[in-house]
Each structure stands twice: as C-alpha cells, then as structure tokens.
Design a protein with these regions (language model features):
Chain A
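Short, small-residue alpha-helix embedded
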Residues: 174-207
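Charged C-terminal helix
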Residues: 5-8, 207-243
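Conserved N-terminal subdomain of the carbohydrate kinase-like
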Residues: 2-97
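Short, well-ordered alpha-helix to beta-strand connector turns
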Residues: 21, 63-64, 119-120, 142-143
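Conserved beta-alpha-beta core of the PfkB/ribokinase-like small-molecule kinase fold
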Residues: 56, 65-137, 147
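Glycine/serine-rich anion-binding loops at beta->alpha junctions
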Residues: 28-33, 168-181
C-alpha cells in the first residue's frame, strides 16, 4: 500500500527540506511552541511563531507553509486565524490544521469549521480529535486527513498511506503530536502531494522516536533524544528501519 | 507527625492517580506550561491548558481538578479565572492556587483574594508568597496551606504534615514549584483529604528530586532526570527513601 | 582590541552577578521564556516574566534590568512596553532590546523605533535584524549595538569588543539568542559599562556553548549541556578557553 513511500522517496523529501530550509509559520499552543521550534530546526526547517493579528500575515507572507494548532487558542490567536487563511488562499500556500482537544470545546469546533473550508487543507489529529471532526471532514472534498496513533493513517487525494513507526513513549511527552504536525507542514512546503509529504514527515518522526526510545531512560529524556535522532537521520537509517 | 503518611499511603495515592488518570486543567504561566504538562504525564495524569475565557469552562468541565497559577497572568487569563471558580464551586471540584510572585503585584493580590473565597481551596507557595498571603489566609477557614522549601509544611484541616525531601537544585530550575502544584492537584482529584493528597504529591516530587540530583550534572539536566524518576517511582523506592 | 576584557574581568563581572543575584524582568516571547529563565538561573540571576499591562511595572520595579524581546509580541505585550520604558527612564534602569525578526514585521519596526528612543539602550540581534535596524540605530547616539554571529561584535560608547566564542549548534536550538540577550541584561544590572557587560555575558555564553558542543549528541541535548556548563563556569575555565 505504501509502495510509493519507500526509503528513497522519504529521503528525497527530507533532503528537499534540508536544502530549501522552508520557513513554517506556526500559530500554535504555548505548551508546544518550544519543542515544535526545536523539532523544525532539527529537521532543517525554520520556525516563526508570530501571533499578533496586526503582524501575523506580514510574518507568514514569505513562509513556505502554515500550521494552525488550536491548543491554548487565545482571543488574539482567534483573530489571527482569518488573516492566515486569507494569506494561504491568496498564495496557495499549504496549511496544516492540528485540532487539539477539539472534542472538548465548541469554540475550537467552530474555528475548525472555518479552517476546513480552505481548499487542499491538511488535518492531523489523534483518534478522538479526528472522530469529532468526521462530520465536517465528510463535507470537505480534497482534504488530507491524518489520524495518528500506533499506526498512522493518511487519507490523501492521491491515496492511502499507513505508517507503522513510533513508540508508546511518544504519547507521554507533551507537544510531540503538535510538533509532528509542524513537520508535516515543512514537507508540504517542498512536496506538492500532501499524502507523500505527510508520509515522509511521519516516517521520519516515527523512526526518530524508535531510536530515541532505545536511548531514553524515560519520558524526561525522550524528547532530547528524539530531536538528536531527527537531526542525524539519513537514508541508510531509513533503509534499515523501513526494512 | 506524619504517621498517617507512610510509604504505603503515598504509594496508594500515586496508584490511584495512575489508575484513574485524572485530567488536571491548568491555567498556568507560559514559562512553566511545558514542564508542568510533562510532569503530570510522568505522574500518570493528563494535562489540559485552555485559557480562552470562551472555552475554559468547557475544557475544564470534565477535569478531575483545577490549578490556577498567577505567573504571567494575562488579561484573558484574568477573565478565565471567574469561569473556573464558578465551575469548581458548582461541581465541588478541587482547586489549587499557586500565587507566583504575589508579593510583587497588587493585581495578583486582588486575584488571590477572589480565589481564596472558594471553600476547600488549596494554596501552595514559597515562603515569601505564603507570608504575603498570610492575612488573607487567616480569614479563610478550611483552606489547606502549603509552604514549600527545604522542609515543606502542609497545614490542612485534617492536620499538619511536614515533608523533608527534595534537593537545592530544585530551586535552580524554572517552573518546578509550579509543576509541584499541578501534582498536588492531580492527587486532590483522587484523594478527598487535601492534606494527604498534598503530602503524597510533595513526597513523590521530593524523592524524584533526590534521585535526579544524584544523576544530574547541573540544573540543565536536572528536570529531565526528575521527570524520568517520577515516571518510574514505585513503592519499593518510596519505602527505601522514606526510611 | 579586547585588552580590557580578559578572563579576570569577565570572571569579576560574573562573580558580581552571582553575588548580587539581580532580577531581570523579561518581556519575552513565549517560545524562549523557559530556556531564558533557566539560563538566568544558571547564571545566578533571577527571572521574572510578567506581561500584563496592569502589573508589569509593579513586578519590574525592583528588577536590576529589563529585557524586551519582540518575538511573539501580543497586543497585551505591546501595551506593556510603554510601562517598561517609563520605568526604565524614571529609574535609569538598564534595558536590552532583542528585535527578533524585526525585518519581517512593520509592527515590530514601529515598536523598535519607540524603544530605541530610550537613552543608553542596548540592542542585541543577528545580522539580518541589526541590518534592518541600522537606519534607526544611526540616529541613536549612546546606544550599544550587539550583532551576534560566528564572531559577536559589540559597538559600545566605551569602544568595540569582538567575541569569537561559541559553536554552530547554537543556531540550531530555539531561544538561545534570546537567552543570551537576557544574560547581557543580567550583566548590565551589575556593570555600568554596557560594552563590558555585554562582552562578559557573551564570552560566558560562547564558552559554555563550546563546552556543551563537546558533550552533546545533537541539538536536542545541547541546551541542557549549555545550561550545565554555564552553571559551573569558573575563572580557571575562562582562562583556559580565552587563551
């Protein structure tokens, strides 16, 4: 099923990120900002995180992709969202939505409804979040839906991809799912097929997680090893790990 | 004095947290959010950190306990506080106040005054913060007062507890005191006696700190080891360390 | 050129920080808050990070120095800036500006223009940021301009200092430049010559970075080792590393 997503293809997309160094503008929650920025840097991309409605479009204008993560959304972040949507629409810029805890908040559900109207939207959430969004997503043709878990499932216009990498410790560290959404955005900045882009990002993230788990003494040391592993991931490692 | 807080009792409260996996809704400062969330996850609890006044009550509604930490309070966070107080009052949900730097800010003192009106409130601060609040606390019957330091002192309706665990490095890492307040909240979600709940949380936190200090090369590596130690703390370790 | 900035001079300024334990009030971006606070603590200083316009001047009033960092500036942070400028002006308190991504945001450029009117202002940015500010800085007599990079260049009223310490990994971890600005502020709290203060801070920071690079397996573990190295930096190490 993943014939089109072998180690060579993943390595090629990662190499394009490392060469192009795309900036990913992240309107993201304050809990995950730091680990998200460090993960993007380790991946070869550049983070920017402006949130002020009066500057967010200026700062995001030259970014290669945009991430909107609804965790700890603030009133100012809420006002920044339409600016980013307008920019993404006008420039055809890739945009990834991470609907953190959307199942708990009617406010986030309303914001997600607006965001999902963007053509070509990519959404990454966990099982509960994606289930809560299912009725909206059913009415969103052309969206790429990514449900992460023990096996990540990517439903893209170009087909279905499943990624079976990663480690349970990844659910014990805050912000890692959020950071993986930023990696998906970074790959979307260099690869026009969002299914392949998401597949490459989540394969790299999952394999870095496997390596980190072998080196960690628990959830405290895990994120550090994950970032180190991501920064040194090469095609040989991908080949070995992807079998 | 701590006859009722031996290793078996502490282990029993920790086991209830690990089994019930209570969600702790944290309205907390942006400096400490990440380490607080990771500490709660290592403890077996689930963090949520919404702050927007239009959603904070929705997100906190099904949480097992609430933490209000006044560090980096924002105008929106200020407006979120009454929503959380109303929720805690209506549901009888445990609420912990962490009055960061209250001695420096008349705004925080006013907010603390409102929060302390909540029946059954639990307050954890350092010596300076608790001293600044002393006049207010004197007029707050039924409150549980926790002053942390070289020896943590817990004055609860059920009695006095003193915890002599921990390490000086814990004062050299930002957000650890804030995170300990979140652990107190997690224990309050499963243990109705706030004195015992706070005692169990601070014993676990202090012992994890002792273990981390033995493994750390300085304050940079300390938090990581603390989280690793907290995630693997078991009754045998508690027994050994509590003598 | 740096005859006045030998290891003994640097050690003397660091010792004054460790003894006076100045509080540095940081109005800084939410991405860098945690690493900035931990770096200040490792340096022997105390961080405070209030941002609410109704309390920021109260909290900063007794601080030894102020940092204003424009990253992730919020509407409330924008309103806090004039309160901090008024305080710095009234008390003659040192103030450091970190103009993150000022080249991307007309809003930040306007804010920087206001801040640069403060007599004795110290500015630290990377090459792109300092170049964008060059026209404003040309009209700012008495300012200290710090351009960090492979070689840090400090142009102070008392002369020119160049610091050739550090490691490329320092650009791969988010918030380290921001944290270095906070260290400059901490030194300005104890040393009246901002050129010497900045030189001492950036020498310590750069040498800690060199030590960290020798101990790190990548950007994930780098910040931890940098903070450990900063916390244990002594005159003997400075002497060896400064040749």
């Amino acid at each position: 099923m993943n014939a089109r997503l072998d180690a060579t293809r993943v390595a090629s997309i990662l190499a394009r990120v490392a060469q192009a160094r795309p900036r990913v503008h992240c309107l993201t929650n304050t809990v995950a900002q730091n680990v998200t920025a460090n993960m993007l840097l380790a991946f070869g991309a550049i983070p920017s995180m402006a949130v002020h409605p009066d500057e967010v479009a200026d700062v995001a204008a030259a970014a290669g992709a945009i991430l909107i993560n609804l965790g700890t959304i603030s009133p100012e972040g809420e006002r920044a969202i339409p600016r980013l949507l307008e920019l993404a629409r006008a420039q055809g810029k890739p945009l990834v939505l991470d609907p953190v805890f959307v199942e708990l908040s009617p406010l986030r559900m309303r914001l997600a409804e607006d965001i999902l109207r963007l053509p070509g939207i990519v959404v990454r959430g966990n099982g509960g979040e994606m289930q809560a969004l299912a009725p909206l997503l059913a009415a969103t043709p052309g969206a790429t839906r990514i449900t992460t878990g023990a096996v990540d499932r990517i439903e893209a216009p170009s087909g279905l991809f499943e990624i079976a990498h990663g480690h349970p410790l990844m659910t014990k560290v805050t912000g890692l799912g959020c950071a993986s959404s930023a990696l998906v955005a970074a790959c979307c900045a260099v690869e026009p097929d969002p299914g392949l882009a998401a597949g490459a990002a989540l394969t790299a993230f999952g394999i870095a997680g496997e390596i980190a788990a072998e080196r960690s003494a628990g959830p405290g040391s895990f994120a550090m090893h994950l970032i180190d592993a991501l920064a040194s991931l090469d095609e040989a490692t991908l080949l070995t790990r992807m079998g």
